[in-house]
Amino acid sequence: MSMYMPGATAVGITFDGGVVFASEKRIAFGNFLVSKTTKKTFPITPKVGATCAGLVADMQILSLQIAALAKIRKMELKRDVPPNTVAKMMSNMMYERRYFPLLTQVIVGGVVDKPIMYTLDPLGSVLPDEYAAVGTGAEMALGVLDPQFKPNMTKDEAIDLAKRAVRAASLRDSASGDGVDVLVITKDGTEEFTEEIK
């Protein structure tokens, strides 16, 4: 972790009928703990959401701009904007800023036809996956996700796995911690809640 690139841990998991995002709540710059209550999960549309690691301010701006573009696109298409379209819009915006990049890693996903998820780096490359982890705690989170993820999990199994992955990273990564924010997206809409890390 560099002095000006804060650490974080964020994960995303697809399950049978939706996607779940989880992130911890800490922001630290170098040795300084800036915040213990930062939200790093973002609903973009009622059917698409995202989570991030890196500069949260950059992700806040990106999510607001993409949410506005998605509303315009929905009015043009007269139907829900699918996750791959949202991921591509994010990718385009991040690539346009490649010389002054948005310093954030993003997991974006949702469900319109079927659950799908993508990981984006600060330059906008789009990588599809069934589950993902980003940030300084990604290695620890993937140590939980890799052996325990299975396709077509139930909603409760996916939420539990996401929380355990973030918890494992928070216990070993000094830049992660102070609670878990969870965002669940299904065809019925979004659900958000916060839990302490125990």
From Swiss-Prot:
Family annotation (Pfam families): Proteasome
Domain of life: Archaea
InterPro entries for the chain: Ntn_hydrolases_N (IPR029055), Pept_T1A_Psome_bsu_arc (IPR019983), Pept_T1A_subB (IPR000243), Proteasome_bsu_CS (IPR016050), Proteasome_sua/b (IPR001353), Proteasome_suB-type (IPR023333)
Residues of the active site: T9
E.C. number(s) listed in UniProt: 3.4.25.1
Catalytic activity: Cleavage of peptide bonds with very broad specificity
Propeptide residue intervals: 1-8
Coiled-coil region(s): none
Biological processes annotated in GO: proteasome-mediated ubiquitin-dependent protein catabolic process
Activity regulation: The formation of the proteasomal ATPase PAN-20S proteasome complex, via the docking of the C-termini of PAN into the intersubunit pockets in the alpha-rings, triggers opening of the gate for substrate entry. Interconversion between the open-gate and close-gate conformations leads to a dynamic regulation of the 20S proteasome proteolysis activity.
Gene3D superfamilies in alphabetical order: Glutamine Phosphoribosylpyrophosphate, subunit 1, domain 1
This protein's UniProt keywords: Autocatalytic cleavage, Cytoplasm, Hydrolase, Protease, Proteasome, Threonine protease, Zymogen
GO CC annotation terms, alphabetical: cytosol; proteasome core complex, beta-subunit complex
Compartments (UniProt record): Cytoplasm
GO molecular function: endopeptidase activity; threonine-type endopeptidase activity
Record's function text: Component of the proteasome core, a large protease complex with broad specificity involved in protein degradation.
Subunit structure: The 20S proteasome core is composed of 14 alpha and 14 beta subunits that assemble into four stacked heptameric rings, resulting in a barrel-shaped structure. The two inner rings, each composed of seven catalytic beta subunits, are sandwiched by two outer rings, each composed of seven alpha subunits. The catalytic chamber with the active sites is on the inside of the barrel. Has a gated structure, the ends of the cylinder being occluded by the N-termini of the alpha-subunits. Is capped at one or both ends by the proteasome regulatory ATPase, PAN.
Record-stated family: Belongs to the peptidase T1B family.
Full protein name: Proteasome subunit beta 1
Source species: Nitrosopumilus maritimus (strain SCM1)
Organism lineage: Archaea, Nitrososphaerota, Nitrososphaeria, Nitrosopumilales, Nitrosopumilaceae
